[in-house]
Regions:
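Nucleotidyltransferase catalytic core that binds NTPs
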Residues: 1-171
Length: 171
């Protein structure tokens, strides 16, 4: 069984991420979308890592060979634990390539059995990031072209709670 891992922060998962997930899912027997926890950023995200995993599970529910998980270990070690042979990485721009190749080389030093494959972003998602989606949501923009419909209300509600907290209002 060929298992691949698509690591990222996914705060939140976007339609660009989902596009990569769907394309990668047809290439592997099993695809694990793994929320990577950066200890330096653990309290700075919109959603907790556990909430992100739950959002991803809802979004990929109809993809039978895709699952969501969370890890705070090195991705190369996590891949070894899961017996994964491949990391999936999305590239939005040429500028992403240099950093991702460096990371791929480091990961293969840690886990020589691990390859990295790159999926170029679909043209309509090259500009899209979780940060862009969150910023648009803060200003009540239509999110249909940015986020999976299953999670739009979650993002809006979370931002509303954050806004209330910043304004000193209680919910």
């Amino acid at each position: 069984m060929k298992t691949a891992i698509y690591p990222g922060s996914f705060d939140p998962i976007t339609l660009g991420h989902l596009n990569i997930i769907k394309r990668a899912a047809v290439c592997f027997d099993k695809l694990i979308v793994c929320v990577m926890v950066n200890s330096e950023k653990v309290n700075r995200g919109l959603f907790t890592p556990e909430e992100r995993v739950e959002l991803i599970r809802r979004v990929v529910a109809k993809l039978p060979n895709v699952e969501a998980d969370c890890s705070s270990t090195l991705i190369a070690e996590y891949a070894r634990q899961k017996r994964a042979c491949t990391l999936v990485k999305g590239l939005r721009a040429v500028s992403d390539f240099e950093q991702e190749v460096q990371m791929a080389m480091i990961n293969s030093k840690i886990n020589p059995d691990l390859d990295t494959v790159f999926f170029p972003s679909s043209e309509k998602y090259t500009y899209l990031s979780s940060s862009v989606a969150k910023e648009l949501a803060r200003y009540h923009a239509n999110l249909d072209e940015f986020l999976p419909r299953e999670i739009i209300d979650d993002v809006k509600n979370k931002l509303e709670i954050r806004s209330d907290e910043c304004d000193g209002r209680q919910r």
